[in-house]
Amino acid sequence: MFYETTGFEITDSLESNWLVIKEELTRLQPKNFMLWPEKFLYNHGWNVFGLYAFGKKLEDNCSLCPETTKLVESIPGITTAGFSSLAPETHIVPHVGYSKAVLSCHLGLIIPNDCGIRMGSQTKKWTEAKCLIFDDTVEHEAWNRSYHPRIVLLIDFKKANFQSCLN
């Protein structure tokens, strides 16, 4: 299930600073990224550069992206954050997330045509400089059918910190 982003003040901060975030992303090397750990969800091409994992700050990675880290740390209840890259012709199979306590936010940074995400019966496309917020405990899948990588800033945060936005 997707949520309207207008009620979430975090999206204003992320969207207005998207070029700063993208600039830090472009300074990273491919070797800085690692395979997404749940390899059963994809055949190839899903890589991540983590900043936070399950509430733990990844200090070395955060030092390479100081401005992005500051923005991420301003989000109440942050649990996970990092750059998520889908290589060309990659498909993440339908799956569900683990916790009803968190919501996910994707900020579009490098978005070629023919990329999308399906959440339940809804399908959306990422847009550069715009956020999508969703509950990943609803079955979802994502794809990049283009010949260029798709990269978003992925953030998971505790739902309880944003109850007023969910009504």
Language-model features: where?
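Short, surface-exposed charged micro-motifs
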Residues: G82, H106, E141
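Short beta-strand His + acidic residue motifs that chelate non-heme Fe in jelly-roll/DSBH
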Residues: I92-H95, G116-R118, F134, H140-S146
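A short hydrophobic beta-strand segment most commonly corresponding to one strand
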Residues: S104-G108, C131-I133, H148-S164
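Short, solvent-exposed loop/turn segments at secondary-structure junctions
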Residues: P88, V138-E139, K158-A160
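Residue-level recognition of conserved beta-strand positions in structured domain cores
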Residues: S85, V96, M119-S121, N144, ...
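Fe(II)/2-oxoglutarate oxygenase catalytic core
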Residues: M1-V102, P112-C115, I151, Q163-N167
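A short beta-strand-loop-beta hairpin characteristic of the jelly-roll/cupin
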Residues: L109-E128
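Conserved metal-binding segment of the jelly-roll/cupin
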Residues: K125-E139
